[in-house]
UniProtKB/Swiss-Prot annotation:
<feature type="binding site">
    <location>
        <position position="132"/>
    </location>
    <ligand>
        <name>(6S)-5,6,7,8-tetrahydrofolate</name>
    </ligand>
</feature>
<dbReference type="GO" id="GO:0035999">
    <property type="term" value="P:tetrahydrofolate interconversion"/>
</dbReference>
<keyword id="KW-0028">Amino-acid biosynthesis</keyword>
<protein>
    <recommendedName>
        <fullName>Serine hydroxymethyltransferase</fullName>
        <ecNumber>2.1.2.1</ecNumber>
    </recommendedName>
</protein>
<dbReference type="Pfam" id="PF00464">
    <property type="entry name" value="SHMT"/>
</dbReference>
<keyword id="KW-0663">Pyridoxal phosphate</keyword>
<dbReference type="InterPro" id="IPR049943">
    <property type="entry name" value="Ser_HO-MeTrfase-like"/>
</dbReference>
<dbReference type="GO" id="GO:0019264">
    <property type="term" value="P:glycine biosynthetic process from serine"/>
</dbReference>
<comment type="function">
    <text>Catalyzes the reversible interconversion of serine and glycine with tetrahydrofolate (THF) serving as the one-carbon carrier. This reaction serves as the major source of one-carbon groups required for the biosynthesis of purines, thymidylate, methionine, and other important biomolecules. Also exhibits THF-independent aldolase activity toward beta-hydroxyamino acids, producing glycine and aldehydes, via a retro-aldol mechanism.</text>
</comment>
<keyword id="KW-0554">One-carbon metabolism</keyword>
<dbReference type="InterPro" id="IPR001085">
    <property type="entry name" value="Ser_HO-MeTrfase"/>
</dbReference>
<keyword id="KW-0963">Cytoplasm</keyword>
<keyword id="KW-0808">Transferase</keyword>
<dbReference type="InterPro" id="IPR019798">
    <property type="entry name" value="Ser_HO-MeTrfase_PLP_BS"/>
</dbReference>
<feature type="binding site">
    <location>
        <begin position="136"/>
        <end position="138"/>
    </location>
    <ligand>
        <name>(6S)-5,6,7,8-tetrahydrofolate</name>
    </ligand>
</feature>
<comment type="pathway">
    <text>Amino-acid biosynthesis; glycine biosynthesis; glycine from L-serine: step 1/1.</text>
</comment>
<dbReference type="InterPro" id="IPR015424">
    <property type="entry name" value="PyrdxlP-dep_Trfase"/>
</dbReference>
Length: 435
């Protein structure tokens, strides 16, 4: 029998080269993005800054592992450790929201919503969600979205007098159109939602109630916003935004039978192998959200957004609905004659990042808009308090006032504000070891 010689393995640079060594172009772009996040004030309400631990989990070798199926029921071998990670994510999610069921595999909030639709509806069924211009989301029945193409999408809005949901109008609409599914929640509604009232309406017309709490999930987990779980048949959410985890989605329910349908809808219905490195990041973020300091964080998120709103109001600008109960606020620029797109650009030149956004009954196109959406999660994560958010509001007013006077923007004012922003952000560094 011949001797089998096994040569010593070569130490491959494939496993040792850094991204700077192997791909300078991508490394440079990442470096510049880190600098942008450090030097600019992030006010986009759907963005946040994750912990170093979440970054490490998401950049781990779990990205190598295929794991179609669910813990204990995989279609591949070698899943014992990713099973541990996914089970941790599931159990922590259930504990955070008081849920009996959780699916942490959706790759996004949109796919979580699609999973619910696939489980509960058939093409042509009627859904009732908040209209996009009133603060809803694309996936709640907007015409360009799958939800507006595959289903008969009806919508409810807000009162013109105070920009709040009119529950009597929602009830009347539900009775009129008889939806199979009612969707509560949105992407630009700053006030608390009465989930108990939505459930009453759903029961009256025999509809399922789905709550999309993508924007407020962290506030719910921290106890500063009403929990929809006791009222909804199903809740969907993203895992970033106020929950401060990696970008991804999740489905929650207290109905185990519906849970089986949601599992089948996500896999094999919509997705194949889950992103295990992202699920690891979710597990870490959920663990962070279970700590006592997370409640303090979300309490500050709300207080900071209210301080920002007050500073903007004191500067002569209108806040939709007169204020906020959450992490976001909408600035109505119509009284000043400004458009959302030009305001967004002027503020970004001053290193304040937010987004143009439609306001209720907005006459402008979605690419133009009459408003700005601002939010407090990211800057609160880096340590800003009420004093800093008040200053940020004052700086915003200064840039916007200059834009009223000079429609192309005032370069001198923007430069002065930019230097003030850089001085402020320098006091609150992020990822210093990555800079």
């Amino acid at each position: 029998m011949p001797d089998t010689q096994i040569e010593a393995g070569n130490e491959s640079p494939f496993f040792t080269r850094s991204i700077v060594e192997s791909d300078r172009e991508v490394a440079h772009a990442i470096h510049e993005e880190i600098n942008r996040q450090q030097n600019q004030i992030e006010l986009i309400a759907s963005e946040n800054i994750v912990s170093r631990a979440v970054l490490e989990a998401q950049g781990s070798p779990l990205t190598n592992k295929y794991a179609e199926g669910y813990p204990g029921r995989r279609y591949y071998g070698g899943c014992e450790y990713v099973d541990v990670v996914e089970t941790l994510a599931i159990e922590r999610a259930k504990a955070l929201f008081g849920a009996q069921y959780a699916n942490v595999q959706p790759n996004s909030g949109s796919q979580a919503n699609q999973g619910v639709f696939l489980a509960l509806l058939k093409p042509g069924d009627t859904i009732l969600g908040m209209s996009l211009d009133a603060g809803g989301h694309l996936t709640h029945g907007a015409r360009p979205n799958m939800s507006g193409k595959w289903f008969k999408a009806e919508s409810y809005g807000v009162r013109e007098s105070d920009a709040r949901i009119d529950y009597d109008a929602v009830r009347a609409k539900a009775i009129e159109v008889k939806p199979q599914l009612i969707i509560a929640g949105g992407s630009a509604y700053p006030r608390e939602i009465d989930f108990a009232e939505f459930r009453k309406i759903a029961d009256e017309v025999g509809a399922y109630l789905m709550v999309d709490m993508a924007h407020v999930a962290g506030l719910v987990a921290g106890g500063v916003y009403p929990n929809p779980m006791p009222h909804a048949h199903v809740c969907t959410t993203t895992t970033h935004k106020t929950l401060r985890g990696p970008r991804g989605g999740m489905i929650l329910s207290n109905d185990p039978d519906l849970g089986k349908k949601f599992n089948s809808a996500i896999f094999p219905g919509l997705q194949g192998g889950p992103l295990m490195h992202v699920i690891a990041g979710k597990a870490v973020a959920f663990g962070e959200a279970l700590q006592p300091e997370f409640k303090d964080y979300v309490t500050r998120v709300v207080a900071n957004c209210q301080a920002l709103s007050k500073a903007i109001t004191d500067g002569g600008y209108a806040i939709v609905s007169g204020g906020t109960d959450s992490h976001l606020a909408l600035v109505d620029l119509r009284p000043k004659g400004l458009k959302g797109n030009s305001a967004e650009q002027a503020l970004e030149r001053a290193f304040i990042t937010c987004n143009k956004n439609g306001v209720p009954f907005d006459p402008e196109k979605p690419t133009v808009t009459s408003g700005l959406r601002v939010g407090s999660p990211a800057a609160t994560t880096r340590g800003f308090g009420v004093a800093e958010f008040t200053l940020v509001g004052e700086l915003m007013v200064r840039v916007l006032d200059a834009l009223v006077d000079q429609p192309d923007g005032d370069a001198e004012v923007e430069a002065e504000v930019r230097e003030q922003v850089k001085a402020l952000t320098a006091r609150f560094p992020i990822y210093p070891e990555l800079a």
